[in-house]
């Protein structure tokens, strides 16, 4: 299983587009009389900064290089002082004020390696993992961001990278990289500071792991389950196609969901559009639902996040895909409305609106335009779509797709989220 950045958790973003506080980004004129939700606060992530803007495009805050907790009310800044030691600042992302600071001896760095890699946070955001940046050793700091427990250092012999950390702070999951796309998932017991013998695999499956616990696949995306115990990742097996790896971070067990629509019969087109697989967690009334969806292929699977199995498969009409490599990789390629009844999906062009009651396609928005990220306002009324080049945000009526305005950004972003009120 690969890494968890985010947001994903659900989307925890490591950085964003730049701009100074109070700067007006001069959004383009409205293309219709549709109104926007003036109180929405957007968080834009990029390579080296995180910028907070309001619904008019005005920069509210420049947070710098931070890791965002779920909901983006809190962020964490990692800074190295002149003596070569590390300071971890806990920031109120609504005000920019530092609420707590911790000192670590030596240099420590965020564990994320890619734009959609794991942020190092547990699903609730309480535990933050930092890594030793030196390539000749493996060491991690497990930090209780509430300040109730002192940071714990763990040194692991060999070469490992971060995968996930349990919400109880007791299990640190690591990826042992082997040859090519082969890997093993291991767990370190945080209280004892030692690596637990054996690999974390689905013992019922022989398709994704051999007798030595060696798995095969490349990471695409991930999200935490409804209560923080399960962590779901999409992997692409090099010959069989995509599957979901489900890791129970509390029980230290794993299950593989192999009945995604194209697993076992993925051709050149399905392999080329692997980056468009996205996971989105939603809730209808009191029941959580997990959607695995690919907007480039028009493929959708409804997954029960409690029983860990596919409940329903569906297809929807999209422009005919080709076997050419994807021109870009969505950072948040699917989003569920807060009321749970609408699923928005990004394709290579356009935004597809899926009715979550029967998994049918209801509409296609912004036909011909390409986007890399989606966010839905808390009142279900407004849809924000980050352009594929990261330089603008389309603001749409979430029910009709009618464009309200376009926010032009001062510099390119690669992810978008809405800050919880």
Range-by-range predicted roles:
Residues 1-16:
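Sec-dependent bacterial lipoprotein signal peptides
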Residues 18-421:
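Predominantly soluble domains enriched in secretory-pathway, periplasmic, or organellar proteins
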């Amino acid at each position: 299983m690969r890494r968890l950045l985010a947001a994903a958790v659900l989307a925890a973003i490591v950085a964003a587009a730049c701009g100074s506080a109070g700067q007006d980004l001069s959004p383009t004129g409205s293309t219709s009389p549709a109104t926007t939700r003036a109180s929405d606060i957007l968080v834009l992530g990029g390579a080296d900064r995180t910028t907070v803007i309001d619904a008019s495009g005005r920069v509210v805050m420049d947070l710098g290089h931070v890791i965002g907790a779920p909901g983006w009310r809190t962020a964490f800044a990692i800074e190295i002082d002149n003596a070569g030691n590390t300071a971890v600042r806990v920031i109120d992302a609504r005000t920019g004020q530092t609420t707590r600071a911790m000192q670590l001896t030596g240099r420590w760095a965020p564990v994320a390696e890619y734009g959609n890699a794991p942020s190092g946070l547990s699903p609730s955001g309480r535990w933050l993992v930092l890594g030793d940046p030196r390539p000749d050793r493996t060491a991690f700091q497990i930090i209780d961001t509430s300040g109730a427990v002192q940071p714990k250092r763990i040194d692991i012999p060999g070469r490992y990278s971060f995968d996930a950390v349990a919400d109880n702070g007791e299990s640190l999951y690591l990826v042992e990289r082997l040859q090519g796309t082969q890997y093993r998932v291991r767990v370190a017991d945080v209280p004892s500071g030692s690596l637990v013998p054996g690999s974390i695999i689905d013992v019922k499956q022989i398709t994704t792991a051999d007798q030595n616990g060696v798995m095969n696949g490349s990471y695409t995306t991930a999200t935490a389950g409804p209560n923080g115990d399960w962590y779901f990742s999409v992997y692409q097996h090099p010959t069989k196609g995509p599957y979901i790896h489900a890791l129970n971070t509390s029980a230290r067990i794993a299950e593989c969901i192999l009945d995604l629509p194209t697993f076992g019969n993925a051709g050149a087109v399905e392999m080329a559009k692997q980056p468009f697989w996205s996971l989105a967690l939603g809730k209808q009334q009191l029941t959580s639902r997990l959607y695995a969806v690919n907007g480039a292929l028009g493929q959708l699977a409804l997954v029960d996040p409690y029983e860990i199995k596919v409940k329903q498969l569906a297809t929807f009409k999209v422009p005919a895909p080709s076997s050419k490599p994807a021109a870009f990789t969505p950072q948040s390629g699917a989003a569920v409305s807060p009321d749970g009844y609408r699923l928005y999906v990004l394709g290579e062009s356009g935004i597809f609106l899926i009715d979550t009651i029967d998994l049918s396609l209801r509409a296609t928005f912004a036909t011909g335009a390409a986007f890399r990220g989606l966010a839905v306002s808390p009142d279900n009324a407004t849809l924000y779509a980050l352009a594929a080049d990261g330089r603008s945000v389309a603001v749409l009526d979430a029910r009709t797709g009618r464009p309200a305005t376009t926010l032009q950004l001062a510099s390119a972003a690669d992810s978008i989220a809405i800050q919880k009120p």
